[in-house]
């Protein structure tokens, strides 16, 4: 279900600042009915928000278990401290780099 950035902003503003909000933009590349489908703008207002995207849908990399994340620097630094045991293998990293670099494919 697509929610507008304003609806997302309104929801987040009602939550406690210690609640982690994860916005799933797995299908962002398929959304054509709005001018700016991403909730990226809320990252500047709310430091407790993650926006996550998968490469399995638009990039066709379901078997590689790769994606991307946007967040405040503070949350990104925290993720770096726990990421290592769950890091990607080399093949997944190479596939993700190649897919991400091929903007014409999208």
Predicted feature residues:
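PLP-dependent aminotransferase class I/II
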Residues: 48-106
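Active-site pre-lysine segment of PLP-dependent enzymes
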Residues: 1-21, 27-58
